């Protein structure tokens, strides 16, 4: 396979012997071999237990009966990354110098949700896993006297993590059993409502004093961490297993509400895409300091 990496760096003085800068940028892309298909499809890793007839039957039911496009056969994906760094160094005077550094990262990759040999998932059942991170650090070093020196350091980091289904979120996770094997379509049940954001701050002051043959150190530091974590499985509907019964639904059944479907024994579970099973959430928050 081929991995593409592009980048550059540049640096030099802004003010001679006083102020300097450095910057670097890099982007990369590498393939992820995710393609899969039915027997004889010549698309990635074929599933010998899945015939073209059954594949087309499931796809046509989704499109014609539920007005949902499952995305077709999945192709290979990619992982892309973008990152850059900026740095400034300042020689304030003979006693003091400062450094500021900024780092940025943005990466995403396409992943399969259920990719075992006994599983096949349409393309819209895949999901994109990504993260965006920013970090800023500031450092000030001081030599007050021959005996006394100090350092101040501050760092701030934010990170946004994402897991987003490749297709529409408003169609529940469907599992169609073919013997002991399974076909998946719809939004993966664990990627329908996800959010993870963190923000951390770190501050430190340290000093050192030479007292004769002794070295006295002192300092203070504080770290805070805020976390927001949301994971709502089945936010747009849970996992539903069916196959032949999906063809047997009458037109009248398709118009019933979710509750009506469960209460009416003459109806199958073919209207699952309309289900709203509530949106509970779990949120975590934490902070600490010392």
Residue ranges of predicted features:
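Acidic, glycine-rich flexible loop segments
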Residues: 1-132, 144-146, 158-160, 173-177
């Amino acid at each position: 396979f081929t991995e593409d990496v592009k980048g550059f760096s540049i640096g030099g003085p802004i003010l001679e012997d006083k102020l300097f800068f450095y910057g670097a940028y890099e982007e990369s892309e590498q393939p992820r071999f995710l393609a899969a298909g039915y027997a004889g499809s010549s698309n990635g890793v074929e599933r010998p237990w899945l015939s073209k007839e059954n594949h087309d039957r499931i796809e046509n039911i989704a499109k014609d009966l539920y007005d949902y496009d499952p995305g077709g056969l999945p192709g290979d994906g990619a992982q892309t990354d973008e990152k850059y760094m900026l740095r400034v160094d300042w020689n304030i005077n003979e006693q003091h110098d400062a450094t500021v550094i900024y780092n940025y990262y943005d990466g995403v990759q396409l992943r399969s949700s259920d990719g075992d040999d006994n599983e096949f998932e349409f393309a819209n059942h895949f999901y994109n896993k990504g993260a965006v991170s920013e970090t800023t650090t500031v450092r000030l070093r001081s030599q007050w006297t021959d005996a006394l020196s100090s350092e101040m350091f501050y760092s701030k980091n934010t990170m946004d993590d994402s897991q987003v289904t490749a297709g529409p979120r408003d169609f529940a996770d469907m599992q169609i059993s073919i013997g002991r094997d399974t076909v998946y379509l719809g939004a993966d049940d664990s990627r329908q409502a996800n959010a993870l954001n963190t923000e951390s701050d770190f501050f430190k002051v340290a000093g050192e004093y030479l007292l004769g043959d002794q070295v006295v150190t002192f300092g203070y530091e504080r770290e805070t961490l805020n976390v927001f974590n949301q994971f709502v499985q089945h936010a747009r509907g849970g996992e539903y297993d069916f196959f032949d019964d999906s063809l047997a639904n009458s037109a009248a059944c398709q118009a019933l509400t979710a509750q009506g479907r469960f209460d009416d024994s003459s109806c199958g579970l073919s209207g699952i895409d309309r289900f709203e099973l509530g949106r509970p959430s779990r949120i975590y928050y934490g902070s600490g300091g010392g």
